[in-house]
């Protein structure tokens, strides 16, 4: 599980490297395809049936649309912005947004400690995106808009995942979500991108396999298996590894300078998630 979370963190600078070769719309379908292959292998090893989500199909389709939007923002954000910052914003803010959505749409009650956690999380968010410097141009050019949208749609996908959990094994659910998302992406998939990917060098392929088969396919699978064995509370605590892995790997491989506000904001966001889940 620790290796899976490290791979999630390392996938952020890897996505930036991949973004130097092609645009998001050229890569999304292939990313889903490689992840599906990895999931099929895992499902075969663990004898997980490929059950069609008949009863929860509307939740699967809804989650698929959000996952497609998330992957575009993930690839576009890392292409134009700092991958290390994205690797802090998305993993730390998405659990907070998931909690907010669960209160709004699932009618979960808000307790006092959870209110404190949300305030702490808001402070963290302000520091992460350096809200005092924000205007329309800097939000887009910095890539922060894509990271914020990514965190939001990932939280929405998590809500639909919870609604579908009664019918499907988590890995089976992920397979159908990514599979349907791939179908949704096909209409905007350029024809020349079908073969262009095979002309890229080994640097591209190492990083692309990391963000698709390892991080998206095997990493997600490891997370779900740990969730089933340890429970969602303990499993989610491993997510705290992701921001630090993203920051360190972005600094090592891309030479990104991580701002102090990113570190402090990430700590505040992690504290908020801890307070809410305590």
Task: Explain the meaning of each model-derived region.
Residues 1-26, 69, 73, 136-163:
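Glycine-/small-residue-enriched transmembrane alpha-helix faces in small-molecule transporters
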Residues 13-21, 76-79, 83, 129-142, ...:
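Membrane-interface helix termini and inter-helical loops of multi-pass transporters
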Residues 26-41, 45, 57, 61, ...:
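Hydrophobic alpha-helical transmembrane segments of multi-pass integral membrane proteins
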Residues 28-30, 72, 85-93, 160-183, ...:
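Helix-helix packing/entry segments at the starts of transmembrane helices
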Residues 18, 27, 31, 77, ...:
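Hydrophobic/aromatic residues within transmembrane alpha-helices
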Residues 41-47, 94-119, 244-264:
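C-terminal transmembrane-helix exit sites in multi-pass transporters
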Residues 39, 61, 113-132, 185, ...:
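Hydrophobic transmembrane alpha-helices of multi-pass small-molecule transport proteins
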Residues 7, 11-12, 40-90, 127, ...:
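Specific transmembrane alpha-helical segments of multi-pass solute transporters/efflux pumps
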